[in-house]
Every structure is written in structure tokens, then in C-alpha cells.
Amino acid sequence: MEHGDRHITVVDENGNEQLCEILFTFESEDFGKSYVFYYPVGAEFEDEEETEIHVSAFIPGEGEQEGELLPIESEEEWEMIEEVWNTFCAEQDEE
């Protein structure tokens, strides 16, 4: 995972690179991890039901070093992420 201020380059299992925009990041004290919500550049984030949103745990890079995306490992993690997502969507609806 390479990233700038608001973008990351995600490399899939086939070695294909895709530039993605970071929607938001957060940390979970319960799981001791950082998480990032992101979507492909070019997809407009106006309707979250129509935009493919990805989420991964991540280890930030230090200095010039690249960070690393990690898979979500448990059902409990997914439940926590879903709560964070629902809160984010509710806040967006209020704006």
C-alpha cells in the first residue's frame, strides 16, 4: 500500500495497481488496529449504495516506507466496522 494525503495505491493478488481515494480512517482500541475505508478514484462518493467501498486494516508506513493493508480477520471485527460505517453514513445524511 502506497499512499499520499488522500490516496492509496492498492495492489491486488494479480499485481494490478488501482488508485483509490481514502474516505476516512479510524483506530480501534478494542482490536489494536487502524482501519481505512476507500474507493476507486473516478467513482463518485455521492450514493454509498452505488459506490464500491472497501475497508481494510492497515499498518501505516514510516517515512518513505510503504504501509500495508491487512484483511479483516473476524466476525467481531466486521461487526465493529459495520457500526462505524453506519455512524458515518448517518452523519453524512445529517449534512
Swiss-Prot record:
Pfam families: DUF1292
InterPro entries: UPF0473
Top-rank lineage group of the source organism: Bacteria
Entry similarity comment: Belongs to the UPF0473 family.
Xref: HAMAP family: UPF0473 (MF_01448)
Designated name of the protein: UPF0473 protein GWCH70_2487
Protein species of origin: Geobacillus sp. (strain WCH70)
